[in-house]
A protein has these predicted regions:
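Conserved acidic residues
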Residues: 7, 48, 69, 105, ...
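Structural motif
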Residues: 44-45, 66, 132
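Short, polar loop motifs at secondary-structure junctions
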Residues: 55-58, 194
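Short phosphate-binding loop-to-helix
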Residues: 58-108, 123-127
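Conserved core of the sugar-phosphate nucleotidyltransferase
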Residues: 87, 115-205
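Conserved alpha/beta core of the MobA/IspD/sugar-nucleotide pyrophosphorylase nucleotidyltransferase superfamily
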Residues: 2, 179-238
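N-terminal glycine-rich phosphate-binding loop and ensuing alpha1 helix
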Residues: 3-53
């Protein structure tokens, strides 16, 4: 809890994966990928319950071994590669409310593909949201340079470079550009009532919580897995 408010952490983990077979339970530094997010959630000083939403009995068993609650097996219609994550989150919240009479003031989404995000990151994000009276949601963001619009170009039909607005390309000094950020995907936090009503974490009352770029690495294919494992070994993750 935080300031008397209850917090739930939800880890969505379906069985299917096109980029990396059995992605959510692929070994990473001696643990299944999903274990890193479960354990980070359990170590958070603010999260009261960590649950895993999955359509797989195997993933459910592994999640339980690492301490997560698995109160249901996700319905097949919510486990396709086109299912919006928000539908999975809302389903979990409604199940707990209707079947177990459990309600939480804040909801934290922890994608299992972001194993570099730890409990300190989670707690910083939760506290930032709770401490900001004017906000009802928060998402993790990272500063980007290579993808800054100032450095992006288009191509004409004849492969000549064009500015994004079809104008002449003008050289830009890195020191002159404004910072821009991307949604880095490792953490989403929201007031639960607002989340259910809006069905999104991103709206005009959403804060950005800045994370270093290396924290934003996601495991979606074998190349990602190799890079993330190298970082973990270098930084001596627990």
């Amino acid at each position: 809890m935080i300031n008397g408010k209850s917090v739930i952490g939800i880890v969505p983990a379906r069985a299917g994966s096109k980029g990396l077979p059995r992605k959510n339970i692929v070994p990473l530094c001696g643990k299944p990928l999903i274990a890193w997010s479960i354990e980070a959630g359990l170590r958070s000083q603010y999260i009261d319950l960590v649950i895993v939403s999955t359509d797989s009995n195997k993933i459910a068993g592994i999640a339980a071994e690492y301490g997560a609650s698995v109160p249901f097996i996700r319905p097949a219609e919510l486990a396709t590669d086109k299912t919006p994550t928000i539908d999975v989150v809302i389903h979990a919240l409604e199940y707990l409310n209707n079947q177990r009479k459990q309600r939480f003031d804040y909801t934290v989404l922890l994608e299992p593909t972001s194993p570099l995000r730890d409990e300190a990151d989670i707690d910083r994000a939760i506290k930032q949201l709770v401490d900001n009276i004017g906000a009802s949601s928060l998402v993790g963001i990272s500063r980007t340079e290579a993808q800054n619009p100032a450095f992006l170009v288009g191509l004409s039909e004849n492969n000549f470079l064009l500015g994004l607005d079809q104008s002449e390309i003008k050289p830009v000094r890195r020191q002159e550009i404004k910072d821009v950020y991307f949604l880095e995907g490792s953490i989403y936090v929201s007031d639960t009532k607002t989340l259910i009503a809006r069905r999104t974490f991103c709206h005009q009352e959403t804060l950005g919580c800045i994370f270093p770029k290396w924290k934003s690495l996601e495991v979606d294919d074998i190349d990602d897995l190799i890079m993330v494992e190298a970082l973990m070994l270098h930084k001596k993750f627990p």
